[in-house]
Swiss-Prot record:
Homodimer. Belongs to the ferredoxin--NADP reductase type 2 family. It is an enzyme of class 1 (oxidoreductase). It comes from Frankia alni (strain DSM 45986 / CECT 9034 / ACN14a). GO terms for molecular function: ferredoxin-NADP+ reductase activity; flavin adenine dinucleotide binding; NADP binding. Keywords: FAD, Flavoprotein, NADP, Oxidoreductase. FAD binds at D28, Q36, Y41, A81, F115, D274, S315. Its EC number is 1.18.1.2. Binds 1 FAD per subunit. This is Ferredoxin--NADP reductase. Its cofactor is FAD. It comes from the Bacteria.
Length: 321
């Protein structure tokens, strides 16, 4: 089995395919396993993964890599899945580096594809000098005044994570309605994070590093300057599925349409996780785990016609086949 995408769903899929007795390779365009969690949110605390009241992104990825390692999957990192070709009893995927992988079945767990942070309209000259789009390490913000820009889950999660470490945290949003999870909003409102609505960053000042930030009140036009050493722009990102759009897949709202078995309609190609779309779809890490298990189980008879879809329940050291 070839799994395209080494994020949380892909890593769990590698474990589960190994559990079903398959050999597995994972291909990902990023240089490290973990997908968006590793690349953008390694320090963010995740609260909605079963069995973990709270776990940092990096720790979750480490646990998934360890879990998959017992079946020794092959990692093909820093290369994008580019071309798909069919053989009578297999598919061949060619990577952007020319690496050809022949597999009985492919499971696409590519998240949202290649993702690029939406830039802050002003202050891009300070990128890497106090302006960041994600927080790789929390401790570097100790005793700093931090401005977090945005109104979604990432903005609120970063504000909450930085609150006990930074000297001050200010959350700036251009509206008074937020897209973040209601429970997270309540936690931020109950913290010492200052929330400024109807506000935007007008300018960022400083020589080598950020020294102060100029904010504008969008309804009145009033401006004020406050000290800051860091700005976290959590404005979301744009996603691009790249070559996958040329694989003959049925697309639905920039996602891959699948049926209840996670089958894409393209022979020997399944998909799971955030990249998929079906009625009632909810994009969570937790649902991605269930979807990739469904995909692997339904792919098992494609790999081996003698295999059953339902593997039975795991216990002890037994392995399903």
């Amino acid at each position: 089995m070839l799994i395209v995408g080494a994020g949380p769903a892909g890593l769990y899929g590698a474990y589960y395919a190994g559990f079903r007795g398959m050999s597995v390779a994972l291909m990902d365009s990023l240089p490290e396993a973990g997908g968006q969690v590793t690349a953008m949110y390694p320090e963010k605390v995740i609260y909605d993964v079963a069995g973990f009241p709270a776990i940092r992104g990096r720790e979750l990825v480490d646990a998934l890599v360890t879990q998959a390692a017992q079946f020794d999957p092959t990692y093909l990192l820093d290369q994008q899945a580019a071309e798909l070709a069919h053989e009578p009893d297999a598919v061949v995927v060619t990577s952007s580096q020319g690496h050809r992988v022949r597999a009985r079945v492919v499971v696409i767990t590519g998240g949202l594809g290649t993702f690029t942070p939406r830039p802050l309209p002003t202050g891009t000259g300070h990128l890497g000098r106090g302006l960041v789009y994600f927080v790789p390490k929390l401790d570097v913000y100790a005793d700093q005044d931090v401005i977090v820009v945005g109104g979604g889950d990432s903005a609120f999660d970063w504000a909450l994570a930085l609150e006990p470490i930074a000297r001050s945290v200010t959350l700036v949003h251009r509206r008074d309605r937020f897209r973040a999870h209601a429970a997270t909003i309540e936690r931020v409102e109950a913290s010492r994070v200052e929330i400024l609505t109807f506000s935007e960053v007008a300018a960022i000042h400083g020589e080598d590093r950020i020294e102060k930030v100029e904010l504008v009140q969008t309804r009145t036009g009033d401006r004020h300057v406050r000290p800051a050493q860091a700005v976290v722009a959590a404005l979301g990102f744009t996603a691009d599925l790249g070559p996958l759009t040329r694989w003959g897949l049925t697309m639905a709202r920039r996602h891959i349409a699948v049926d209840s078995t996670m089958f894409t309609g393209v022979d020997r190609v399944f998909a799971a996780g955030d990249i998929t779309e079906y009625p009632g779809k909810v994009r969570l890490i937790a649902t991605g785990f269930g979807e990739v298990a469904t995909a692997v189980n339904n792919a098992a008879p494609v790999v081996d016609p003698a295999a059953k879809v339902f593997p039975g329940h795991s216990s002890g050291d037994s392995t399903a086949s």
